[in-house]
Amino acid sequence: MDPIRRHLLKAAGLFVTSRAFANDQQGTSMQPSSVKPRHVLCFLGKDESLLHPPEAVARTIADFGFEIDRTYSQARPDPHMERSFGVCWDRVFPKAWSAADEAAVANHKAVLYLLSPPLEQQKAVAFSAAALRIVEEMIEAGATAVKGESAGIAHGLERWRSLGDQARKGAKTSQGLGMTLAVAKACRLAFAKRPLGGDRYNETVGYHLVGLPEIYVAKSRGNEWAAVMLMEELANAMAERSIEATLRDQKLTLTREQDYAEDDFKFNPYGIIRVEA
């Protein structure tokens, strides 16, 4: 077993509380939700072999507690995929997908869905890193397109590979492998989408997959790029110093009010931070 795989398995099962979660997660009197997030990964392929991953990949899926959703996976094209990927492509990172990626979506012949186990907040980054590892192995095995359903985010194959590489390299420290800030950031970039334009805010969705609350930035503060920069700044601060400390230092508060119902995969049980004008 390679060191990265061993490290991820250990982190997912024997995770030691890190600085990002050293204090009260809410930083307010808000009662915690009992909802636990889950990854839903969507893979497209050229034929029905997609539904039967190679033994090595199947072992990785099982080792990390993921499972194939046999109800919605299918050995035929899904006519809605072009539109779905069209609204999910990451539009922040330059050239996050290519014409070849669009063609792969248009020409797919099979769809596979994977579900993660419910995520504990302290283990969210570890399981997201595992999800990224599974994405890499599925691409290696022939998957032609990948989308994170829990936040509605899609990247091209090269971008997925790059994010996986970032997570691997980011796990290396002078003391060995660790769930570092670099790993958390790679997972956030892989599985969260931003900015989504609401009526009043530019919003994130998917930060629950790395154990963080969503960040909503008032549109009156500036353009979308300014909102993305602030989202990154606050997310990095929460991962490094703790949610509570960041809320205190920035004089921000959490709220539970959100548009997603608790049974929606986009529901964030850790709340929302609204940054007003």
Report the location of each language-model feature.
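N-terminal export signals
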Residues: 7-24
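Aromatic/basic-lined ligand-recognition segments
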Residues: 153-249, 257-258, 262-277
